[in-house]
Every structure is written in structure tokens, then in C-alpha cells.
A protein has these predicted regions:
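Short glycine/serine/threonine-rich phosphate/pyrophosphate-binding segments
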Residues: 1-4, 13, 20-28, 37-38, ...
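Conserved phosphate-binding catalytic cores of ATP/NTP-utilizing and phosphoryl-transfer enzymes
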Residues: 1-18, 183-187, 191
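Phosphate/ATP-binding catalytic cores across multiple sugar-kinase/actin-like superfamilies
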Residues: 8, 112-139, 185-189
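A short acidic Gly-Thr/Ser loop motif
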Residues: 10, 17-24, 30-34, 44-46, ...
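Phosphate-binding glycine-rich/basic clefts of nucleotide- and phosphate-handling proteins
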Residues: 31-114, 139
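Short, surface-exposed connector motifs at secondary-structure boundaries
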Residues: 34-36, 137-142, 164-167
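Glycine-rich phosphate-binding loops at beta-strand->alpha-helix junctions
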Residues: 77, 81, 136-160
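Conserved phosphate-binding/catalytic loops in two-lobed NTP-binding clefts
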Residues: 158-183, 192-197
Length: 197
């Protein structure tokens, strides 16, 4: 992902990237073609979808599918307090078995996402705590770069910034950074061979 967003990882400069994918969130401090510290957790976009699904089961006794859960996350999901929006959600009533539609607020969805968002922020903090001081100074100046589909969750950059006191930037094309980086490595195997070892 770091290569795909254009970071020159060969320099003696500390960069930190947070890749919030579907199944995992990977955080790495990179310098001189190597990973200095890293943290991987199995909490990412899929877990967020599951938390929304469980929220509807527990709070509203409504069965929704994972596709609906992901759609809700994309449309009104957020990591922080935002302008509240109401949305209609269709599902199957767990008590009667009959289809029904309910109105929910984006604030409820934020509550449903609280645990996975907190887990991601805590993993970022752990990675920062393990970073050598000379690279920490670079990171404080350059900021944290967030990539992957999970970086599109509204407010995820703001909450990481607030809780770490480090600037945060979302990658320009966060969904394609890993694919683009893989392509660049394959086109320049000699240049990136140290990264592959």
C-alpha cells in the first residue's frame, strides 16, 4: 500500500501507513525499504459490517443481510459525531418473521461501529508507541496515511488524529493503493527486492 500511494520507502525517513481492508487492519512504520514496527488486527471493514448486523438484531430485533449492513455503513456510517441523518432499513422482524421497515439515525450506526473503530485506533497507538524516536519525529511531521476501503468511513481520519495528536491523511485513491503498489513492485523487482525478503 505504501508503494502504491507513492511513498519513497527507500529513504531514511519514517512513514506510517494504516491499511484498513476487509478482513484485517495493518499498520506499519516503514523506513529504508523495511518495516520497523507493525501491528495487524483482524478488525476491519467486514467486522464493521458484522457489528451493524448484530446491532440490528439486538437493538431492533431485525434481521438484515451483510449486503444491507455494508450499504448502511457506506451511506451513514461514521467514526465520529456528524450531522445526524435518518435512513430506512428493511429486514425481517425476528419476533413475527414478517418483513418490516424501520427508521434509524446515523448516531445509532456510529454506536454500532464504536468497538471496531476503537480497536483500530488503539492498534495505531500501539504501533506509534513502538516507533523509535528518530522516526517518530518524521511521522509527526509527515503524518499518518490511511488507505484501504475502511479509510472511507466518515471521520476515521479525524478520530485517529484526535486520539494520537498526529496529522492524518487519507490516501488519494485508497481502494487501489495495494493493487497499484503490487503492480509497481512487479514492474521493478530489482528496485524493490529488499522489500520482498
Amino acid at each position: 500500500a505504501a508503494i502504491g500511494i507513492g511513498l519513497d520507502i527507500s529513504q531514511p525517513i519514517g512513514n506510517i501507513i494504516v491499511d484498513i481492508g476487509g478482513g484485517t487492519t495493518e499498520i506499519a512504520v516503514i523506513s529504508l525499504n523495511g518495516v520497523v514496527t507493525k501491528e495487524t488486527i483482524r478488525i476491519a471493514g467486514d467486522e464493521m459490517d458484522e457489528c451493524i448486523l448484530q446491532w440490528f438484531r439486538n437493538e431492533h430485533k431485525l434481521e438484515i443481510g451483510l449486503g444491507m449492513s455494508e450499504s448502511i455503513k457506506k451511506s451513514v456510517g461514521s467514526a465520529m459525531q456528524m450531522n445526524s441523518k435518518e435512513i430506512s432499513v428493511r429486514g425481517r422482524d425476528l419476533v413475527t418473521g414478517i418483513p418490516k421497515t424501520i427508521e434509524v439515525s446515523s448516531d445509532e450506526i456510529r454506536q454500532a461501529l464504536k468497538d471496531p473503530v476503537n480497536a483500530i485506533v488503539e492498534a495505531v497507538k500501539r504501533c506509534l508507541e513502538q516507533t523509535p524516536p528518530e522516526l517518530a519525529a518524521d511521522i509527526l511531521e509527515r503524518g499518518i496515511i490511511v488507505a484501504g476501503g475502511g479509510s472511507l468511513l466518515k471521520g476515521i481520519d479525524q478520530i485517529i488524529r484526535e486520539r494520537t495528536n498526529v496529522p492524518v491523511n487519507v490516501a488519494e485513491d485508497p481502494l487501489l493503493s495495494v493493487v497499484r503498489g503490487t503492480g509497481m513492485v512487479l514492474e521493478n523487482l530489482k528496485k524493490y527486492e529488499a522489500v520482498l525478503l
